[in-house]
């Protein structure tokens, strides 16, 4: 059977098929990211020379700019292809927004605390206060919170935002979770000290965060989970985060356990203990009645023309 070009591009409802919309979205986001970062570098160099040399601003800016490009790309796609308002992307100000952020912060910190407690009780790690100016700790905390918030918002916009929602519409929830989670893992393929367990755990993290979105129809919960996981892991407890070390973490970590359990130089995300923590979190999110969407989020999702 030979398909017409119109059937390849459009579905039976006359809407551009999900695969094409995702491709357009990624092209828009890529072009926007390139333009925003180039403009930032040019402006910083010519107008704000001190900012151009700021290591800390240089770490936050790319995440924020790529995140902005991802949201702008979503706005264009939603407006001209999906006929949906931008607030259906997942960052709308709704009645459960504060609850979802609080749930993400508490659950993310609890998960890392349990992981750290098990490793400490098993004698695999020990913790001590890091050296340095203790008075700078609050400012350093705020800095890392900003970095990890920008990073989490960027990654969630890209992997649980418009592209994921189009996948849900095109191939269903299960297929969308699988595809996006594998893509999320492959994005970490070249991280320092990565291993097979780390890639598996990153797939599980993608499933975990996808469920957080699907249960709430909002990006507040997955973003706060993602941010708090990284902040707790790297800054508070002093572990490597996906192979990256926080040089001014508040805790000094000494590691002695086997790499296949602790993750070694990659951090806990490269060990089987993290696998168990993530599986438990997936089960909890899937079954918890406390994780639910706001009424406004439900109405937005189920309005005409939506997935």
Task: Please describe what each predicted stretch is.
Residues 154-179, 211-218:
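Membrane-interface helix/loop boundary segments of multi-pass membrane proteins
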Residues 130, 187-196:
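Membrane-interface helix caps and helix-loop-helix hairpins in membrane proteins
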Residues 1-86, 90, 234-307:
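N-terminal, membrane-interfacial amphipathic/helix-forming hydrophobic leader that caps
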Residues 183-184, 201, 225-230:
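Transmembrane alpha-helical core residues of multi-pass small-molecule transporters
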Residues 64-69, 138-145, 158, 200-204, ...:
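Membrane-embedded alpha-helical segments of multi-pass membrane proteins
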Residues 112-113, 148-149, 172-189, 202-203:
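Small-polar-interrupted transmembrane alpha-helices in polytopic inner-membrane proteins
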Residues 2-6, 40-62, 84-157, 164-169, ...:
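Juxtamembrane helix-loop-helix connectors linking adjacent transmembrane helices
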């Amino acid at each position: 059977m030979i398909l017409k070009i119109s059937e390849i591009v459009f579905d039976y409802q006359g809407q551009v098929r999900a695969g094409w919309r995702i491709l357009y979205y990624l092209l828009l986001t890529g072009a926007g990211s390139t333009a925003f970062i180039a403009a930032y570098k040019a402006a910083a160099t010519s107008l704000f020379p001190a900012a151009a040399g700021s290591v800390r601003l240089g770490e936050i800016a790319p995440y924020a700019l790529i995140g902005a490009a991802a949201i702008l790309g979503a706005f264009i796609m939603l407006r001209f292809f999906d006929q949906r308002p931008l607030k259906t992307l997942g960052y709308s100000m709704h009645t459960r927004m504060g609850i979802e952020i609080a749930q993400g912060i508490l659950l993310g910190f609890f998960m890392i605390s349990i992981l750290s407690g098990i490793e400490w009780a098993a004698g695999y790690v020990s913790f001590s206060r890091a050296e340095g100016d203790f008075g700078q700790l609050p400012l350093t905390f705020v800095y890392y919170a900003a970095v990890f918030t920008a990073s989490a918002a960027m990654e969630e916009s890209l992997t649980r935002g418009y592209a994921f929602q189009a996948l849900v519409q095109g191939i269903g929830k299960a297929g969308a979770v699988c595809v996006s989670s594998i893509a999320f893992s492959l994005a970490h393929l070249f991280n320092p000290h990565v291993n097979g367990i780390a890639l598996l755990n990153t797939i599980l993290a993608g499933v975990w965060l996808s469920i957080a979105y699907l249960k709430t129809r909002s990006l507040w919960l997955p973003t706060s989970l993602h941010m708090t996981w990284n902040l707790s892991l790297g800054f508070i407890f002093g572990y490597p985060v996906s192979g990256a070390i926080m040089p001014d973490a508040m805790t000094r970590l000494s590691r002695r356990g086997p790499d296949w359990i602790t993750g070694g130089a990659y951090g806990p995300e490269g060990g089987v203990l993290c696998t168990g923590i993530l599986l438990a979190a997936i089960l909890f999110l899937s079954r918890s009645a406390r994780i639910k969407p706001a009424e406004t989020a439900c109405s937005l999702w189920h309005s005409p023309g939506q997935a």
